[in-house]
A protein has these predicted regions:
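Post-signal peptide N-terminal regions of Sec-secreted extracellular proteins
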Residues: 24-136
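Secretory targeting and sorting signals
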Residues: 1-23
Length: 136
């Protein structure tokens, strides 16, 4: 009796772990480009409940596509109900950015958005790529 209970418990834990691994799978993002900025080699995931706040995780290469213009580049990401969070890149370089964005009041998020922009200063508006929308 005791051995069968342990076997059932072990099988249940294994299947729970396998289910979490599938929910935590990374998906490919399309390459995004706008004047002066490129977001490439992107992957994203929607974390399951109780894992990294159930948030939206992403890892991308952010490239300053026009080194001569003197402008910085950045990634913006947000989840439902919250404003954009900004993650800066570097001028004249390609940097790897890996972050999580989440709603601290919820077990998990269902919708997330991401885009890349070029910071053109305070007098001119920034130009951004199209916004990608990801759903759980």
């Amino acid at each position: 009796m005791r051995r069968s209970a342990v076997a059932v418990l072990a099988a249940g834990l294994f299947l729970t772990g396998a289910g979490s691994a599938v929910a935590d799978a990374w998906h490919t993002m399309p390459k995004l480009r706008s004047e002066g900025v490129v977001l490439k080699n992107g992957k994203y995931t929607m974390y399951p409940k109780f894992t990294k706040h159930g948030g939206f995780g992403f890892k991308v290469d952010l490239q300053d596509d026009n080194a001569a213009d003197g402008h910085n580049v950045y990634v913006q990401a947000r989840v439902e109900g919250y404003s954009w969070r900004r993650f800066n890149g570097q001028q004249r370089k390609t940097v790897r950015i890996q972050k999580e964005v989440y709603d601290g009041a919820a077990l998990y998020v269902s919708n997330a958005w991401i885009r890349a922009c070029r910071d053109r200063g305070s007098l001119r508006p920034d130009n951004c790529t199209r916004t990608l929308h990801h759903k759980r």
